[in-house]
Amino acid sequence: HVDHGKTTLTAAITTVLAKKYGGSARAFDQIDNAPEEKARGITINTSHVEYDTSLRHYAHVDCPGHADYIKNMITGAAQMDGAILVVAATDGPMPQTREHILLGRQVGVPYIVVFLNKCDMVDDEELLELVEMEVRDLLTQYDFPGDKTPIIRGSALKALEGDCIWESKIIDLANILDTYIPEPKRSIDQPFLLPIEDVFSISGRGTVVTGRVERGIIKVGEEVEIVGIKPTSKTICTGVEMFRKLLDEGRAGENVGVLLRGTKRDDIERGQVLSKPGTITPHIKFESEVYVLSKEEGGRHTPFFKGYRPQFYFRTTDVTGYVELPEGIEMVMPGDNVKMVVTLIHPIAMSDGLRFAIREGGRTV
């Protein structure tokens, strides 16, 4: 919530941890005057800081404004591994607190740790316990484990001022992050997936698809599935090439050509994916959380209504889709965020948390 102390906490974490583990402290005003980012045309004020504990290196995002938070959570390219929910002990949970938790659930934030801030200003132990209970209830309402969620009582401002009692609470918070939020699975360890960008046939060799390996590893001789747009089919990878060199495998992050056995050039198209069999499925209908660009951000100048039929851009391709809005919502204004159900005209390989863009006549909506 605005003024509950997110930015002060961010400054306190960098300052206290820099003192203990090395690294650079960031002052409040350096974080608060976050530069505007123009990520994919969306204007978001965000501040990126990094800090170290004895076990890990963290990348941490702080947004000054509520609207910035929403935009960042919905459109942020990187999936968050966890979040720190800051609640002022003096106010307790506010309407925006609920919205942040709900959004965390919808965009797939897997773990939340709570920092109960401004505890130096509350003398009443019972009041602190009441606020904790309220926060736990809210988390439980949105399917987070409210009873098990760690809650650290602290004072970001006092910690920033160097008061050692409150500094120790920041160290506690860091230890909780280290232990409560599990090590994320690196993309190389996840099942193989390659969004197809191009397809061509090489006479005498067969069909080659090219693209950047999104995750996992593909080895020569392995079976793969071709998923999306058309019925799912299976084939064997008979070769991997990079920069015209033949390789034994292609790894996450590499741009490769994959040679496929007995597959015709016309059987495959851009927009499909190559994947480890059984790991991703094609879907026509999905629920989504969408941020609609404002006019100033280059978005629409007018609202849209249910039945709107724009293009949905997934990975490498546009697909036309039909929009249904939640009950009681007649129209969506530029600058709004909304939950919508979309039905595509043909299936696309998707999994929970997949990002996409909505476009109309070549411009992003």
Curated annotation (Swiss-Prot):
Pfam families: GTP_EFTU, GTP_EFTU_D2, GTP_EFTU_D3. Its EC number is 3.6.5.3. It is found in: Cytoplasm. Residues 1-185 form the tr-type G domain. Coiled coil: none annotated. It is an enzyme of class 3 (hydrolase). GTP binds at residues 1-7, 62-66, 117-120. GO terms for cellular component: cytosol. It catalyses: GTP + H2O = GDP + phosphate + H(+). Keywords: Cytoplasm, Elongation factor, GTP-binding, Hydrolase, Magnesium, Metal-binding, Nucleotide-binding, Protein biosynthesis. GO terms for molecular function: GTP binding; GTPase activity; translation elongation factor activity. The keyword Cytoplasm applies. Mg(2+) binds at residue 7. The keyword Isomerase does not apply. InterPro entries: EF-Tu_GTP-bd, EF-Tu_GTPase, EFTu-like_2, EFTU_2, G_TR_CS, P-loop_NTPase, T_Tr_GTP-bd_dom, Transl_B-barrel_sf. Its main location: cytoplasm. Monomer. Belongs to the TRAFAC class translation factor GTPase superfamily. Classic translation factor GTPase family. EF-Tu/EF-1A subfamily. GTP hydrolase that promotes the GTP-dependent binding of aminoacyl-tRNA to the A-site of ribosomes during protein biosynthesis. This is Elongation factor Tu. It comes from Buchnera aphidicola subsp. Melaphis rhois. The gene is tuf.
